[in-house]
């Protein structure tokens, strides 16, 4: 009786790889061998490999059985629950014990004899699979018991804290009498700015806002720029020239020297001799570019009333220096007069 599926060997017989030979063919091989037929002739007649015939006959001569499988059955189980319990006890008493030491203790305590004592590999497998998780759980429980109580959390960034608008507002709020003052970093929690720019992250904007609020000078905001003009600035002091100290100007004119040997001509004029700046026309911020240019002036606002394009500050420059060379300019540098001073 041949199976319906399998592979074909060199003799033309069909076999299934990894499966034992059917019992009917095994019995036929033994019967032909008892009749005195050689194994090679049995192999050709039954179309079974010569190695398979020899193996079956050798097993039959030794055991008297033609059935496949291990002889005498499997080895009895040695890792009984009692053995596992003793192994767990040894491991709990001495966590650093080795597998071969556990094997020797099982023999010494009479738990096992030399026939059913588990091997070192079996003990290691028991320690890894069945007792390892329990040991780890015990260590975790002991760690939780000895763990100290958590300390109260400190406020975030309490050492290197930069001022924020909220802390500044909290500092400005007056504290009622009889109540101790609470620091700003503890009274109100920190809130991060809405944007993620570098100035907001580093707190530069909040610092500049506080400086502008605490400074005695008024800094106009963007909304007030359109209403500012020349007339809004305060007039210069009588002892100042063009907003500068008169003493400093006289000292500079006294000790100042012209570079490259050119005559030194002071460009400073008194505030009384200058014409006032033309008042700019008030332009609406919503005006389009097609508005009439009524606020424009033909000349420069800083030009002197009696000056010329060549001498805007009405300085007396001698005509003899008009087309002189460099040497002549050096010789006549002491004859130059500055009427503006």
From Swiss-Prot:
Gene Ontology cellular component terms for the protein in this record: nucleus
InterPro entries: Homeodomain-like_sf (IPR009057), PAIRED_DNA-bd_dom (IPR043182), Paired_dom (IPR001523), PAX_fam (IPR043565), WH-like_DNA-bd_sf (IPR036388)
GO molecular function: DNA-binding transcription factor activity, RNA polymerase II-specific; RNA polymerase II cis-regulatory region sequence-specific DNA binding
Record localization: Nucleus
UniProt DNA-binding residue ranges: 4-130
Region Interaction with KDM5B: start-end pairs: 168-189
Cystine pairings recorded for this chain: none
Region (PAI subdomain), start-end ranges: 7-63
Residue ranges of the region described as RED subdomain: 82-130
Main location: nucleus
Keywords of this entry: Developmental protein, DNA-binding, Nucleus, Paired box, Transcription, Transcription regulation
Taxonomic superkingdom: Eukaryota
Keyword Endoplasmic reticulum on entry: no
Main function: Transcription factor required for normal development of thymus, parathyroid glands, ultimobranchial bodies, teeth, skeletal elements of skull and larynx as well as distal limbs.
Quaternary structure, from the entry: Interacts with KDM5B.
Protein's UniProt name: Paired box protein Pax-9
Native source organism of the sequence: Perodicticus potto edwarsi (Potto)
Name of the encoding gene: PAX9
């Amino acid at each position: 009786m041949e199976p319906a599926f399998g592979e074909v060997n060199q003799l033309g017989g069909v076999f299934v790889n990894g499966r034992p030979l059917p019992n009917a063919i095994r019995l036929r091989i033994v019967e032909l061998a008892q009749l005195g037929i050689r194994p090679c002739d049995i192999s050709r007649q039954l179309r079974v490999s010569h190695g398979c015939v020899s193996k079956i006959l050798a097993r039959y001569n030794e055991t008297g059985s033609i059935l496949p499988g291990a002889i005498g059955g499997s080895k009895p189980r040695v890792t009984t629950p009692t053995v596992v319990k003793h192994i767990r006890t040894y491991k709990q008493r001495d966590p650093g014990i080795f597998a071969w030491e556990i094997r020797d203790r099982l023999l010494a305590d009479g738990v096992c004899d030399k026939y059913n004592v588990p091997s070192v590999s079996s003990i290691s497998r028991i320690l890894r699979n069945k007792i390892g998780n329990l040991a780890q759980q015990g260590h975790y429980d002991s760690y939780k018991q000895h763990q100290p109580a958590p300390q109260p959390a400190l406020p975030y960034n309490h050492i290197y804290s930069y001022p924020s608008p909220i802390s500044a507002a909290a500092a400005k709020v007056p504290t009622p009498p009889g109540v101790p003052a609470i620091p700003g970093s503890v009274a109100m929690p920190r809130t991060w700015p809405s944007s993620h720019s570098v100035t907001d992250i580093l707190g530069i904007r909040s610092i500049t806002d506080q400086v502008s609020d605490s400074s005695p000078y008024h800094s106009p905001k963007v909304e007030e720029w359109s209403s500012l003009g020349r007339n809004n600035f305060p007039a210069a002091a009588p002892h100042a020239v063009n907003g500068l100290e008169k003493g400093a100007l006289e000292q500079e004119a006294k000790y100042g020297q012209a570079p490259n040997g050119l005559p030194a001509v002071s460009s400073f004029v008194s505030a009384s001799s200058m014409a006032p700046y033309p008042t700019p026309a008030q332009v609406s911020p919503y005006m389009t570019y097609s508005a009439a240019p009524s606020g424009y002036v033909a000349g420069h606002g800083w030009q002197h009333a009696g000056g010329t394009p060549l001498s805007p500050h009405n300085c007396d420059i001698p005509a003899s220096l008009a087309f002189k060379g460099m040497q002549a300019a050096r010789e006549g540098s002491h004859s130059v007069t500055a009427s503006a001073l």
